[in-house]
């Protein structure tokens, strides 16, 4: 029997209804909500042939386990987009764009990174298995559906995976506040991966040493660094800018 996961909030549940409705086993909604947004959602669920159970808000709180649910919770089969690195690269047409997260364990940060990755056309997000958060309900909610569209690969040895990417001609660019080069000096039109460390800690030594290039994000004000999800967005959209220019 496939293991299940809880999806909380309109964005997460609607995204699953759109991409894999058959994976949803049950949907629970707050019985007292009769607003337009809820009505639209109920119509979507009906079109997808999914059963909906009106329940008390307290029941939803218990199912969501602390995740803000907006009156909507679904129980669904776990849906993994995780495949091997080679499988990801083999089907890409044109230059690859990857995001590597080293030590990002906060679910809000991961969810925001996945959402940005989807918007920027990232082919996969990669993280070390022992230093990463799983695709829990909070990640699913913050990602606004991107957890169902962007492959999230957790690997046992990040440095080894990075070396495998280099063998496939993927240029690895790490962000470092002390780097001499600016992110704007990166040739982001080639197959590449942006490598991000955890906020406060940065990349681990071996991760940093495995990068082909280290760059800094220009900081013109008084703050010294950006949140990892914001830094990821800045760098990924530099790739988008160059590739569309």
Curated annotation (Swiss-Prot):
Pfam families per the UniProt record, alphabetical: SpoU_methylase (PF00588), SpoU_sub_bind (PF08032)
Its annotated compartments are: Cytoplasm
Membrane-spanning ranges: none
What keyword terms does UniProt attach to this protein?
Answer: Cytoplasm, Methyltransferase, rRNA processing, S-adenosyl-L-methionine, Transferase
Query: A single GO molecular function, which one?
Result: rRNA (guanosine-2'-O-)-methyltransferase activity
Q: Which PANTHER family match?
A: 23S RRNA (GUANOSINE-2'-O-)-METHYLTRANSFERASE RLMB
Protein name, UniProt field: 23S rRNA (guanosine-2'-O-)-methyltransferase RlmB
Q: Which organism is it from?
A: Bordetella pertussis (strain Tohama I / ATCC BAA-589 / NCTC 13251)
Q: Give the classification, highest ranks.
A: Bacteria, Pseudomonadati, Pseudomonadota, Betaproteobacteria, Burkholderiales
Q: Which gene encodes it?
A: rlmB
């Amino acid at each position: 029997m496939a293991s299940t996961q809880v999806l909380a909030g309109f964005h997460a549940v609607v995204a699953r209804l759109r991409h894999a409705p058959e994976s949803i086993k049950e949907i629970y909604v707050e019985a007292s909500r009769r607003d337009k947004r809820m009505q639209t959602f109920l119509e979507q669920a009906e079109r997808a042939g999914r059963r909906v159970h009106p329940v008390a808000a307290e029941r939803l709180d218990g199912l969501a386990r602390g995740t803000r649910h907006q009156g909507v919770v679904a129980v669904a089969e776990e849906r993994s987009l995780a495949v091997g690195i080679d499988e990801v690269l083999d089907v890409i047409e044109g230059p690859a764009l990857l995001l590597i997260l080293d030590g990002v364990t906060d679910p809000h940060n991961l969810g925001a990174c996945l959402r940005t990755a989807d918007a920027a056309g990232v082919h996969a997000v990669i993280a070390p298995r022992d230093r990463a958060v799983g695709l829990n309900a909070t990640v699913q909610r913050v990602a606004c559906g991107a957890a169902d569209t962007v492959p999230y690969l957790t690997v046992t040895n990040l440095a080894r995976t990075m070396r495998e990417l280099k063998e496939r001609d993927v240029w690895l660019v790490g962000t470092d506040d002390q780097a001499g080069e600016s992110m704007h000096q990166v040739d982001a039109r080639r197959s590449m991966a942006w490598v991000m460390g955890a906020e406060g800690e940065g990349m681990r030594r071996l991760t940093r040493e495995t990068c082909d290039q280290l760059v800094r994000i220009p900081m013109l004000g008084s703050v010294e660094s950006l949140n990892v999800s914001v830094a990821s967005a800045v760098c990924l959209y530099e790739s988008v800018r160059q590739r569309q220019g």
